[in-house]
A protein has these predicted regions:
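Alpha-helical recognition segments enriched in aromatics with Gly/Pro capping
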Residues: 109, 119-214
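N-terminal Rossmann-like or analogous alpha/beta NTP/dinucleotide-binding catalytic cores
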Residues: 1-114
């Protein structure tokens, strides 16, 4: 809520100067579930670890997914404090193809991007894998499906679903090897590059961020 309040202050300041401005409340509901939240152990969410939260059923049964249920808590807070916003969901953004051209450009330049990420923050992962995670066609997990090759002419990535370390936890992969079409199949950019893609696609002029995103 704090980030939204600060961004809303910038929006109001711009409007006070005569500019048109809008606040986008963006739900990263294509991100995978990394752990079961405290107080929710009894809902059987453990089996969904690694799956996009928008593909996990709402354990309370009142929204179309676990992700939308959690998003609704933030939106309720924004409504209560009177913040005006436009709500957007990651799953809709990707399904509608709003980032497909950005994904194509990023994957074509993945070597340069991997080297730059390593240089700036010391993370070498994207020198080995593409900065794009397809949703595994077999187990529906995200972070376990690591893409190693981009077929430019077909706009497809080749990936293997294998065990992946997320923090101190190991998420089990199913071993599936496949291809995913970035224009049709579900998947998402790694957040370090997705940040830039969203700024371009939505014409974002201000958003709080840390130095690891630069």
């Amino acid at each position: 809520l704090g980030d939204a309040v600060r961004a809303y202050g910038v929006k109001l300041a711009l409007e006070n100067q005569g500019y048109k401005s809008e606040l986008i409340a963006y739900s990263d509901d294509l991100d995978g579930l990394r752990k079961v939240p405290e107080g929710m152990k009894e809902f059987g969410l453990e089996e969904h670890i690694g799956k996009p939260v928008s593909l996990i059923p709402d354990p309370y049964g009142c929204h179309d997914s676990y992700g939308m249920h959690m998003s609704s808590i933030l939106l309720d807070g924004l409504d209560k404090v009177g913040i005006k916003y436009e709500f957007r969901r990651a799953i809709d953004t990707y399904k509608q193809g709003l980032l497909k051209d950005h994904i194509h450009t990023i994957l074509q330049n993945s070597v340069k991007i991997g080297d730059k990420i390593s240089e700036l923050v010391g993370q070498e992962k994207y020198q080995k894998y593409l900065p794009y995670f397809p949703v595994c066609a077999e187990c529906n997990r995200l972070y376990t499906a690591e893409a190693t090759e981009y077929i430019v002419t077909e706009k497809k990535v080749k990936y293997t679903c294998h065990d992946t370390e997320i923090g101190s936890k190991t998420i089990k992969g199913c071993g599936h090897e496949g291809e995913a079409d970035i224009t049709k199949d579900l998947g998402k950019l790694a957040w370090k590059v997705e940040f830039a893609a969203r700024w371009s696609a939505f014409d974002i002029r201000f958003e709080a961020y840390g130095k690891d995103i630069m």
